[in-house]
A protein has these predicted regions:
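Electropositive, beta-rich accessory/interaction domains or terminal extensions
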Residues: 1-163
Length: 163
């Protein structure tokens, strides 16, 4: 017997690691997460570690960059351009975008595409609305759920009776 444990309030996808995300009406969830999620990232060219990706913890401005799809889209429905915080639209694999981000970061970067995505910990991130509300209560703020960069924002939980 299926038991309802909650509802999905929102689905988010972040095509480029640490850049602005997009809200989806629906998505395809597979072994490697949500299709199109975190499939692109800037690689720090001077970093040979096992995690060379440029993230918002190193460059908070990345969160203000907005990946956008062209009319035709691309294979795997990936973005074709990025709108900078100043409003400039640049090709996602163009040298201008890499130079702009590298200048802000202070070191060269290059855009990379990975088949299975670039995840810090898990290929899908879920957060409950109750968790966000409790964090807000404790911090005396109303945080935007996107601050936590979830793929799924889960709503209420129902106590299920089994027969």
């Amino acid at each position: 017997m299926l038991v309802e444990v909650g509802n999905v309030e929102a689905i988010f996808r972040y095509p480029v690691k640490s850049m602005a995300g997009e809200r989806l009406e629906r998505g395809i969830l597979g072994w490697h997460g949500l299709d199109g999620d975190r499939r692109l990232a800037f690689r720090r060219m001077d970093d040979s570690s096992s995690f060379p990706w440029l993230t918002a913890s190193r460059l908070p401005e990345l969160l203000l960059f907005l990946p956008q799809r062209g009319e035709c889209g691309t294979e795997e429905n990936l973005p074709t351009h990025v709108r900078t915080p100043e409003g400039k639209l640049m090709p996602i694999f163009g040298t201008d975008l890499a130079k702009d981000v590298g200048r802000r970061y202070g070191s060269p970067v290059e855009m990379m595409q990975l088949k299975h995505g670039i995840f810090d910990d898990a290929s899908i991130s879920l957060i409950a609305s109750d968790t966000v509300r409790e964090i807000g209560r404790l911090a005396s703020q109303s945080p935007d759920v996107r601050r936590f960069r979830p793929n799924v924002n889960r709503g209420y939980v129902v106590e299920a009776k089994r027969s």
